[in-house]
Amino acid sequence: QKFELLSYKKNSYIFNVETNKGVINTKNLIIATNGYTSKVTPWLNRRSIPIGSYVIASQELPESFISKLFPSNRHITDSCRVVYYFRASPDKKRIIFGGRVSSREIDLHDSAPLLLKDLKRVFPDLPEINVSHSWMGYVSYTFDHLPHIGQTDGVVYSRGYCGSGLA
């Protein structure tokens, strides 16, 4: 529901949590914001960096063609440091292809052609196709490339999945 954490304060055994939707009082506070961790938790921000991950969806393609590319209907991720991931769309009509296209944030109109070029590199026998959709989100990369899960001053945190599990 797009809750934004504005501040929090621990009083005895209760956290007073201020969000853009109002104040919440709770016994437990979990920060699971991954690439969207705010300045409210600077102790988490020092442990990782948000990196843009860009995704495209191809135009609709014949289901028989998609089935040849993804016969087991599995999600595929390469093992390079700059990761690409791809799969068939749930309706098996499009190729969903994503990854990091630049060391800096770039416009979606610029990222889509770059991803399409990489998609064609992965699947060189693709016919000429177009991109129908393009979007991006932030993933949290840790300096040791491992997820960070723990507890500090009663606040439980989980982040730094380095792109694993991106939908």
How would you name each of these model-derived features?
Residues 146-148, 154-167:
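Conserved mid-domain beta->alpha element of the FAD-binding
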Residues 1-15:
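A conserved short coil-to-beta-strand element within the FAD-binding core of flavoproteins
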Residues 17-19, 160-161:
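Short beta-strand segments that buttress and anchor functional surface loops
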Residues 7, 17, 23-154:
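Active-site substrate-recognition segment that forms the wall
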